[in-house]
Amino acid sequence: MSLDDQTLRDISRLTLQHYQDSAEAFREGTRNHDVSQNIAALLRHIHSEPPFALLDFGCGPGRDLNTFKALGHAPVGLDGCPNFVEMARQASGCEVWLQDFLALDLPAARFDGIYANASLFHVPRQELPRVLGELRAALKPGGVLFASNPRGDNAEGWNGPRYGAYHDWEHWKQLLEAAGFEQLEHYYRPAGLPREQQPWLASVWRRAEP
């Protein structure tokens, strides 16, 4: 089923309103989440000379911006939630852009790496090819995209007050390859648990060149 422009605007507005209303609780609830495995997965595949220019896509309150900055890199944050943008700026001292995922305005070939941790699943399936293309264009040639999302059976819709699209590996792989990325690795999280207890699908991709 195709989503019309008004429906897409409503999806963004209502999902972002949820995060706006719960920003403080979200910050406290995720403050101590260990995503070091994900950060390492992005950084080890970047072949540029450090410090790396990084985009934290869906940076939330700025936890991972702080980590990238502490590692000596040059991160920029992006989020569609005004409260998160302000929190991230204050917490990290980094540049943070307020942008809706469905209305991006990204510089071309700016970043060595893009870190999309728990963010791209909010993009409706029909819009993903366009959004992935915009992320690809924002990477330098050979740049790296990391993505981690709740996995599923390719259904999408409302999960309480948030909209989400939940892909399995094969479908996600097809989407990324069609958008001009080549696979580097993928894994399930949290590490060390049986697959049925690993709700997160993480993957790393390089911008493919013609």
Model-identified regions with their sequence ranges:
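Conserved S-adenosyl-L-methionine
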Residues: F181-G192
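Conserved beta-strand signature within the Rossmann-like core of class I S-adenosyl-L-methionine
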Residues: G142-N149
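Class I SAM-dependent methyltransferase SAM/SAH-binding core
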Residues: L55, P61-A103
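Conserved class I S-adenosyl-L-methionine
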Residues: S2-E49
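A short glycine-rich, Lys/Arg-flanked "PGG" loop and its adjoining helix->strand segment in the class I
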Residues: P129-P141
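A short acidic, Gly/Pro-enriched loop at the edge of an enzyme's catalytic core
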Residues: L102-I114
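Acceptor-substrate binding/catalytic loop of class I
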Residues: A155-H171
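Core SAM-dependent methyltransferase catalytic element
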Residues: A191-P210
